[in-house]
Amino acid sequence: MNIIQQLEQEQIAQLNKTIPDFEPGDTVVVNVKVKEGDRTRVQAYEGVCIARAGGGLNENFTVRKISYGEGVERVFPIYSPLIDSIKVVRRGKVRRAKLYYLRDRRGKAARIAERAERGSEKGKTTPAAAE
């Protein structure tokens, strides 16, 4: 690990933020701090993560949602002080790192299949438990 990566790791540890493990295709809710006049409130932004870019402190992710029939994309820096929290609503099964093709899709064609988590399948028994 070079000195720049070491400094970034120290700064990330200093921020003390818990970032959930999410990938492109996952539906996430990003709670963003919005300043209106002299007061601050938290606004939820829910959509599909279509890309993650960068690394370390400069990493960011793009969230796409459909608002009143219009596609809206927003890029969030992961370690931004304006982000209150990130929550993963559902995991998507995709085979690409960048889902920009969703921009051209509408309705059912833009749906992403849900990813089945390993070990959470009901009704399946392990061979050791069956004996």
UniProtKB/Swiss-Prot annotation:
Keywords for this protein: Ribonucleoprotein, Ribosomal protein
- Entry GO terms, CC: cytosolic large ribosomal subunit
GO terms, molecular function? structural constituent of ribosome
Pfam families registered for this protein in UniProt? Ribosomal_L19
Segments of skewed composition (Basic and acidic residues): 111-124
Biological process GO annotation list? translation
Which species? Answer: Methylobacterium nodulans (strain LMG 21967 / CNCM I-2342 / ORS 2060)
The protein's role, per its UniProt record: This protein is located at the 30S-50S ribosomal subunit interface and may play a role in the structure and function of the aminoacyl-tRNA binding site.
**Phylogenetic classification of the source organism:** Bacteria, Pseudomonadati, Pseudomonadota, Alphaproteobacteria, Hyphomicrobiales
Location of the region described as Disordered in the Swiss-Prot/TrEMBL record: 111-131
What residue ranges are annotated as transmembrane?
none
Q: What is this protein called?
A: Large ribosomal subunit protein bL19
Q: Give the family this protein belongs to, as stated in its UniProt record.
A: Belongs to the bacterial ribosomal protein bL19 family.
Q: Which InterPro entries match?
A: Ribosomal_bL19, Ribosomal_bL19_CS, Ribosomal_bL19_sf, Translation_prot_SH3-like_sf
